[in-house]
């Protein structure tokens, strides 16, 4: 079997499965990433689709393959770690389409943690020191911001990324915070970190793309920075289309294409498969999607031209509309779909209690 698609009896296609965003820049960045992947698989049909809030949907992308007579699709989730979207929502769409249309869909792994992803992360943080030669890693604390989910395995993987960067660059200290769902959130985490005594704070959003969450992180950083004028805060760029990220996508595709290694996810710490302490009630739960009613919605936010400026959240707050929290996705667009109960939803530094404190102040 050749990488250019020759010597293949049944023509196949590659589907890059994205989450989706209402932010124009995030979608453009995703498209650029897909083009980089296409460049590595010339002669093979490569399409992309989104789970929600952007077009084309995953079904739209699969329809393109069907119209071309493609009978096998290699689907790879464009997500850093395996939480609900990777384990439940995307597979639900793919399985349903496969059964209805008699198309074989082989699902690959999330990007996960490998040397390539660690190197990409280290280089993003190293760029801060290259551009600011007056500061040193040994005098700086690193704050890695993960997305946050109700899946403890996905959350813990962000901590591993933090440690690998800290040791790789020789940082003075490292902390992990999250943008939503779990704890500690960005602002309370930073309020703790500024007490450690380091004069430089490097904030690295461990995200693939731009969007409202990255903007929210910057706004919360500004809030803490105003209260700590003696400290210097620096932003590391999120991953985007870093060459090593593209390399990892190629690795995941090739795991399926050439049946190299094991393309299955690591289930040893999956809360649905293993009796994880504190998550015993979720072992064996039926893994179902709750995105069917938002899939394919593609209304872009028109409050900002390109990069999210946070106007959407400010507008929602002005209207008194509650943002998602406590086991929900935390996006600026309300999902209104059910998530399983998260044991730590009521943590003092989690979204529910912090939201309540803010409302008490107002």
Please place each PLM-identified region on the residue numbering.
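Active-site-proximal alpha-helix that buttresses catalytic centers in soluble enzyme cores
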Residues: 1-362
């Amino acid at each position: 079997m050749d990488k250019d698609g020759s010597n293949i009896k049944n023509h196949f296609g590659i589907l890059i499965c994205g989450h989706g965003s209402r932010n124009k820049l995030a979608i453009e960045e995703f498209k650029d990433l897909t083009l980089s992947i296409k460049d590595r698989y010339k002669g093979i049909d490569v399409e992309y689709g989104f789970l929600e809030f952007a077009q084309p949907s995953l079904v739209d992308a699969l329809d393109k393959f069907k119209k071309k007579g493609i009978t096998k699709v290699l689907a790879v989730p464009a997500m850093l770690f395996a939480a609900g979207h990777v384990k439940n929502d995307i597979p639900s769409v793919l399985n349903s389409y496969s059964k209805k249309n008699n198309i074989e869909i082989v699902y690959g792994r999330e990007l996960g943690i490998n040397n390539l992803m660690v190197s990409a992360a280290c280089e993003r943080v190293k760029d801060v020191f290259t551009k600011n030669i007056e500061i040193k890693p040994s005098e700086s604390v690193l704050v890695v911001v993960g997305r946050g989910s109700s899946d403890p395995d996905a959350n813990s993987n962000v901590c591993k990324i933090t440690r690998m960067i800290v040791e790789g660059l020789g940082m003075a200290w490292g902390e992990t915070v999250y943008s939503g769902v779990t704890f500690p959130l960005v602002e309370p985490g930073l309020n703790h970190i500024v007490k450690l005594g380091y004069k430089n704070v490097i904030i690295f959003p461990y995200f693939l793309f731009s969007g409202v969450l990255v903007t929210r992180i910057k706004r919360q950083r500004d809030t803490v920075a105003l209260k700590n004028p003696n400290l210097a805060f620096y932003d590391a760029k999120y991953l985007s289309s870093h060459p090593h990220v593209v390399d990892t996508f190629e690795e995941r595709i090739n795991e399926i294409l050439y049946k190299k290694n094991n393309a299955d996810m690591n289930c040893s710490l999956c809360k649905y498969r293993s009796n994880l302490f504190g998550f015993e009630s979720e072992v064996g739960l039926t893994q179902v999607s709750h995105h069917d009613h938002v899939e394919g919605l593609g209304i872009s936010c028109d409050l900002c031209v390109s990069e999210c400026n946070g106007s959407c959240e400010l507008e929602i707050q002005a209207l008194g509309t509650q943002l998602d929290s406590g086991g929900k996705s935390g996006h600026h667009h309300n999902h209104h779909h059910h998530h399983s109960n998260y044991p730590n939803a009521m943590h003092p530094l989690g979204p529910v209690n912090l939201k309540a404190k803010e409302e008490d102040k107002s």
